[in-house]
């Protein structure tokens, strides 16, 4: 053997050794991941006490799948990637499903979905995809014999679940007997039991009041409510169910998933009205995007969209792995709940003196953004939630909602955690904090010179929710106050070019932007000024009501509490706060300085009687071309109308733009409330309710 050959052989042996080492490392990591996933599945499915969020579980599963893809020899039949997650509790009788209840594979991006759809259509083109919302609840299997419900069971491990028949019988949406003339001899259906989101908050409040631990989320509430030894407890909870799949059946002959849903509905089973059959992959992705934007318009929590090949013949040909069908997939949305570490609890002093504790977190990505801080509301809330500094906590961020710490993961405590102690003095000005009788909030009473309150009130006045002063942000407000160029919100509209002389960071362009922003803000609607004054309890709803009814700041300032309380959306508490605010000479001086700065203190038409839309209640849903939600709302309110966020029998019109919220649109149809498109909305504003009503045709309810 030559020198070169010996060197090459040595290189090959070294490379082989490296590969063996790498394989050993990945083998160890795969075993570690398998153990972790088994433990998390047990806590989730059996104990209903998960210690990680769904997104973290999914990430661990995907890591194990990637290792097994690189090293197929590590993929064993008992790997978590090859079997249905879950098990069954020993508290209930185990029962075997007639047909296996499989899980679903997940995709998280358009590219991953395209790849899955291409595999599904490899042998035969798919001409119909059924799309439905993925409910975040508890999977349940129902068996009907001769039309009678004989058994209900949890998913368990997909083969064996827990017999929860007495508990499921208490659900109003689950029929004890199927209806209709052609009832199947045998019918096994699968569905999701869920806890309506609106009722979830009520349940947790009742549990806390009774001294019991609250549920972390609606899914846990549904699982905990179903796994009760006493069915009367289950019956007291507002559980609901939607059926979304078939198991074993005899005498139930249909050709497609959509056809099965229609037949199941005829039999009296609860089927979602929000599924759609679509022809193309792009249509499917549009459905996924649409419901991603409207996921909070649904009565239950959803964490994605399930996409199925609609044709049963194609489903049979595609078959399934040991874990999931090849003809269905779950397109998961970005997580809204994750776990992270609570590094510290600090306090923030707000514009009205309220001292609010907030959590400082290990930065974590949730709902599409990275979060490092989250509200804890007040000291009582810290106690109720039982969070300690150093805890691993469940963090929730739904859409545009402020991130919130939901609960601690108590099982992960190691003894190093410590309790939070509320400060006794304001961290900004040193004033002793007070807790007014009957209130949960602790406050700094120094409204005159507390730097935090002055800074926050100026920033709030300029914010988009108030006067929307372009260029006057938090940093600018801080500098202007610190340098003595303004002293409170009363000075803001007296800013002039010379006010910025000698200040670093204020170029001519920046100064011009602020002055233009002030000029535009001088003519904002009255309700925006009311919000900007930082009167306690006065938010947009109360401010709009006061502006609509009284039309000028002078009328509001001089009205007795009884008159203010009679305004829709106000009430005695807000009325008293308004009276108290205007009774303070310092506040009257602030208003006088705002007025002398050229700000309009009355809406157009003040004192002229009712507006043209007086008594008209409008709900706006979807996107209106040329209108933001705020400007559309102001257009209605400036004419005396009222805009609300939910449809009821009191609603006069529902204005539906592009991509309207399904729940509002459907409820309008059910209640036969006139629907207006953008053209109809323009007629409503220009010509009034009668003219708009003539254009709008009440939607008829099918059937």
From Swiss-Prot:
Residues 608-698 form the BRCT domain. Pfam families: BRCT, DNA_ligase_aden, DNA_ligase_OB, DNA_ligase_ZBD, HHH_2, HHH_5, Nlig-Ia. Its EC number is 6.5.1.2. One of its GO terms (biological process) is DNA replication. PROSITE patterns: BRCT, DNA_LIGASE_N1, DNA_LIGASE_N2. One of its GO terms (cellular component) is cytosol. GO terms for molecular function: DNA binding; DNA ligase (NAD+) activity; metal ion binding. It catalyses: NAD(+) + (deoxyribonucleotide)n-3'-hydroxyl + 5'-phospho-(deoxyribonucleotide)m = (deoxyribonucleotide)n+m + AMP + beta-nicotinamide D-nucleotide. InterPro entries: BRCT_dom, BRCT_dom_sf, DisA/LigA_HHH, DNA_ligase, DNA_ligase_AS, DNA_ligase_CS, DNAligase_adenylation, DNAligase_N. Zn(2+) binds at residues 426, 429, 444, 450. The active site is at residue 134. NAD(+) binds at residues 54-58, 103-104, 132, 155, 192, 308, 332. Keywords: DNA damage, DNA repair, DNA replication, Ligase, Magnesium, Manganese, Metal-binding, NAD, Zinc. Signal peptide: none annotated. Its cofactor is Mg(2+); Mn(2+). It comes from the Bacteria. NCBIfam families: dnlj, PRK07956.1. Belongs to the NAD-dependent DNA ligase family. LigA subfamily. PANTHER family: CHROMOSOME TRANSMISSION FIDELITY FACTOR 18, DNA LIGASE. HAMAP family: DNA_ligase_A. DNA ligase that catalyzes the formation of phosphodiester linkages between 5'-phosphoryl and 3'-hydroxyl groups in double-stranded DNA using NAD as a coenzyme and as the energy source for the reaction. It is essential for DNA replication and repair of damaged DNA. This is DNA ligase. The gene is ligA.
């Amino acid at each position: 053997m030559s020198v070169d050959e010996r060197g090459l052989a040595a290189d090959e042996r070294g490379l082989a050794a490296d590969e063996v080492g790498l394989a050993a490392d990945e083998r160890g990591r795969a075993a570690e991941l398998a153990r972790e996933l088994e433990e998390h599945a047990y806590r989730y499915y059996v104990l209903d006490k998960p210690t990680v969020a769904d997104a973290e579980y999914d990430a661990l599963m995907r890591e194990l799948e990637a290792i097994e893809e690189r090293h197929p020899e590590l993929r064993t039949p008992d790997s978590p990637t090859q079997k249905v997650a879950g098990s069954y509790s020993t508290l209930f009788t185990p029962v075997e499903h007639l047909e296996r209840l499989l899980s679903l594979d997940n995709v998280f991006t358009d590219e991953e979905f395209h790849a899955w759809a291409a595999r599904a259509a490899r042998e035969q083109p798919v001409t119909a995809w059924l799309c439905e919302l993925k409910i975040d609840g508890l999977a349940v299997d129902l068996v009907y014999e001769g039309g009678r419900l004989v058994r209900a069971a949890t998913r368990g491990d997909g083969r064996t679940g827990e017999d929860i028949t007495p508990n499921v019988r208490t659900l109003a949406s689950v029929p004890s007997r199927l209806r209709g003339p052609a009832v199947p001899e045998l019918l096994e259906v699968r569905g999701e039991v869920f806890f309506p989101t609106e009722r979830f908050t009520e349940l947790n409040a009742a549990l806390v009041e009774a001294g019991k631990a609250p549920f972390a989320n609606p899914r846990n509430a549904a699982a905990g409510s179903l796994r009760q030894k006493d069915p009367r407890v289950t019956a007291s909870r507002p559980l609901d169910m939607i059926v979304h799949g078939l198991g074993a059946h005899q005498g139930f002959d249909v050709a497609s998933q959509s056809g099965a849903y229609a037949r199941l509905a005829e039999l009296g089973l609860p089927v979602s009205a929000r599924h759609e059959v679509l022809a193309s992959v792009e249509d499917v992705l549009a459905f996924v995007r649409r419901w991603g934007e409207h996921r909070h318009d649904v009565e239950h929590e959803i964490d994605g969209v399930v996409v199925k090949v609609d044709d049963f013949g194609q489903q049979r040909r595609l078959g399934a792995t040991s874990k999931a069908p090849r003809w269905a997939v779950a397109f998961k949305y970005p997580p809204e709940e994750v776990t992270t570490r609570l590094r510290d609890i600090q306090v923030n002093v707000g514009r009205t003196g309220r001292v609010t504790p907030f959590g400082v977190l290990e930065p974590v990505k949730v709902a599409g953004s990275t979060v490092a801080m989250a509200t804890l509301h007040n000291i009582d809330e810290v106690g109720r939630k039982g969070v300690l500094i150093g805890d691993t906590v469940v963090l929730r961020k739904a859409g545009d909602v402020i991130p919130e710490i939901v609960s601690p993961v108590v099982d992960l405590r190691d003894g190093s955690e410590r309790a939070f102690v509320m400060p006794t003095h304001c961290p900004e000005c040193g004033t002793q904090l007070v807790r007014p009788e009957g209130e949960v909030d602790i406050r700094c009473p120094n409204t005159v010179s507390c730097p935090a309150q002055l800074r926050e009130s100026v920033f709030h006045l300029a914010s988009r929710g108030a006067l929307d002063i372009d260029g006057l942000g938090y940093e600018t407000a801080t500098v202007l106050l610190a340098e003595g160029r303004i002293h409170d919100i009363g000075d803001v509209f007296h800013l002039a070019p010379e006010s910025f002389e000698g200040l670093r960071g204020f170029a001519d362009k920046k100064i011009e932007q602020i002055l233009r922003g002030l000029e535009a803000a001088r003519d904002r609607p009255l309700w925006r000024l009311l919000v900007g004054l930082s009167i306690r309890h006065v938010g947009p709803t109360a401010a709009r009501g006061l502006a609509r009814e009284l039309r000028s700041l002078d009328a509001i300032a001089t009205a007795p509490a009884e008159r203010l309380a009679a305004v829709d959306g106000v009430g005695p508490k807000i009325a008293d706060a308004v009276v108290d605010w205007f009774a303070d000479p310092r506040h009257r001086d602030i208003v006088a300085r705002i007025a002398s700065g050229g700000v309009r203190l009355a809406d157009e038409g003040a004192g002229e009687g009712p507006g043209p839309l007086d008594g008209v209640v409008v709900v706006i849903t979807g996107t209106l071309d040329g209108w933001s939600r705020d400007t559309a709302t102001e257009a209605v309110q400036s004419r005396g109308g009222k805009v609300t966020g939910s449809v009821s029998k009191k609603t006069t019109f529902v204005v539906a733009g592009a991509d309207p919220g399904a729940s509002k649109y459907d409820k309008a149809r059910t209640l036969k409330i006139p629907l207006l498109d953008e053209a109809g909305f323009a007629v409503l504003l220009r010509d009034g309710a009668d003219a708009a009503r003539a254009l709008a045709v009440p939607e008829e309810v099918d059937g």
